[in-house]
Amino acid sequence: MADYTFDGRRLVKKSSGQKLAEVDRDTLRSYNGAVFGQIEGKNLRDSHGKKVAEFNGKEVKDDRGKKVIGIKEIQEVIEGEPGMSLAAMWFFFVKGRHDHAGML
């Protein structure tokens, strides 16, 4: 069962209902409005514009091209439609958290 839900715009933690982040066109913002990253085509860039990952539709790869996670594994942690926005939410807001089953 997924720990988070993503409706295409907002990432919400299921257990508490807390809004963690949102997508505003191609900009990823945390709940307090701070910019965390940007979606640019198939690439994910951090708040400084550095490429940190890419998503080819099936898997997220780091900036060196090494596979980090597949979309199926992301969907086990975040409930939502598969796509670039879901992958970006996982990469920036869920990947490093210790409170979910998808910890890598």
What are these regions (language model features)?
Residues 1-20, 24-26, 34, 41-42, ...:
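Long terminal segments
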